[in-house]
Amino acid sequence: MNSNVENIYQLEGRVPVSKAIPFGLQHILAMFVANIAPIIIVAGACGLSSGGMAMLIQSAMIIAGIGTIIQLYPVWRLGSGLPIVMGISFTFVSIFCYIGPTYGYEAIIGAVLIGGLAEGVLGLLAKYWTKLITPVVAASVVTAIGFSLLSVGAASFGGGSGSADFGSAKNLILGGITLACCIGFNIFAKSFWKQLSVLFGLVAGYVVAVAMGMVDFSTLSDASVIALPKLMPFKPVFHPGAIVSVFLIFLVSATETIGDTSALASSGLGRDVKAKETAGSIACDGFISSLSAVFGCLPITSFSQNVGLVAMTKVVNRFTLLMGAIIMILAGLFPIFGTLLATLPDAVLGGCTIMMFGTIVVSGIQMISRCGYSQRNISIVALSLSVGIGFTQVPEIFSIFPQIIQNVFAENCVAVVFLVAIVCNLILPKDMESKNEKAD
């Protein structure tokens, strides 16, 4: 097959490797920080050592590469065949930051193992249930996810919850400098370079942290140069409350995957997504997340920022993204890389992510706008967000319920919003506007 650089705008076809690598690398750089940030946040909340965090970062890069390859080139019914980039999901961060300190990191692994298998099966059966999750339900959930992550970003900005110097001047200054670098790069950078604003902020913030003496390099001396990821580094614990709550978030993740897959087909290929592509995308999400748990890592999902990059550049060639996925896997084979990233101060991460989390809120609001402000949609969004966010601010309100219900819902606003939105969507009449007009 002849290689042609013009094939970068075609799904099929070979592109010269010298051209494919930089375009593929661009996709990896666009999602790099978002891929490792959930690991650093959750590992910190669970009290894992820097060595354990480095191991998880290594696994995250390898799993993200594997997941991306399967999305590009489906295996059986797993994968969409579309240029979808996979990475560690932010959707689960808030619930993991509750499960980890409460039941241990092993309970997270057990819940991901079961939840991923369940989502994978649901993906294979997608045509029977996806109609339940309408755009307004997905929009409500995405908005709730953004709100739930704001406190996580703020905690990192202050130096990490529980740290001895939390909220100190040096942490706030470091977080502020990092945030300013992200914003400045986003303002002055041109074209697709804007997609790398978070990466620029991370590098700039890290350099400043080194200059301020806030980085501990002692762990680098023990890091191997090359190593394979470990199988089952954490023995899974299957806690019922953790499994149920994580399964609910897997359903939320599935709705995001549906949206990303549809958006990519529309913006990148100029057509509607096929049912087979949606089902394969969700199945890949679930089963590869379970594989991720086998390596002690967190769930993966499709990355919206890469969907945005496709929409902007129109680079949809699968071979080009394959080059990026291979680079990601190779990077994961060098533990020194993960160990270096594990030395990243919390304040730098907070400066990078605080605006990113706010962007998720805005994305949810934009999704609500696209659904339209009908009386029915307003009722679904208003009730689900007010109950979900409001009730979980006073978790004692759930005290009359069984412990498993409290474990799942009392401090998990995303799960509550998802449940209330689904129920409202099922019971509210489709013709609320016409009924109101007749009443008038």
Give residue spans per PLM region.
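N-terminal signal-anchor module of multipass membrane proteins
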Residues: 1-84, 91-99
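Hydrophobic, membrane-embedded alpha-helices of multi-pass small-molecule transporters
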Residues: 18-30, 167-179, 196-197, 212, ...
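Membrane-embedded alpha-helical modules
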Residues: 99-219, 323-325, 329-437
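Short juxtamembrane and helix-loop transition motifs at transmembrane-helix boundaries
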Residues: 14-23, 42-52, 68-78, 98-107, ...
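Membrane-embedded helical hairpins/re-entrant loop segments and their flanking transmembrane helices
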Residues: 17, 43-79, 247-318, 438-439
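Helix-boundary and loop/linker segments of multi-pass membrane transporters
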Residues: 9-16, 232-241, 274-275, 374, ...
